[in-house]
């Protein structure tokens, strides 16, 4: 059985036991989270939401907090000696899907 969930402005196809990296969620390692925004539940008898599947939820456990690779943002104006260099590391949360209820 699999499901499509929505979190952090993105959609993810998840299955039980799968490890996943999503946009940052508040919580520490070992905390339980529940996703109620389930768009689709697939399997023997798939359920498609309009837009959400009523009564469906996905349970997960936070396995860690992490940050992505650093990107460099560089702005400049030609001939004006204007330069700004900035770095950014996006925070992520690592999850393990523990259950899907439909």
From Swiss-Prot:
- Keyword Zinc listed? The answer is no
One BP term from GO: translation
One Pfam family, short name: Ribosomal_L21p
Task: Output this protein's name.
Answer: Large ribosomal subunit protein bL21
Role summary: This protein binds to 23S rRNA in the presence of protein L20.
Q: Which family does it belong to?
A: Belongs to the bacterial ribosomal protein bL21 family.
> What organism is recorded for this protein?
Sorangium cellulosum (strain So ce56) (Polyangium cellulosum (strain So ce56))
Lineage start? Bacteria, Pseudomonadati, Myxococcota, Polyangia, Polyangiales
Task: Give the top-rank taxon of the lineage listed in the UniProt record for this protein.
Answer: Bacteria
Q: One Gene Ontology cellular component annotation?
A: ribonucleoprotein complex
Sorted alphabetically, the keyword list is: Ribonucleoprotein, Ribosomal protein, RNA-binding, rRNA-binding
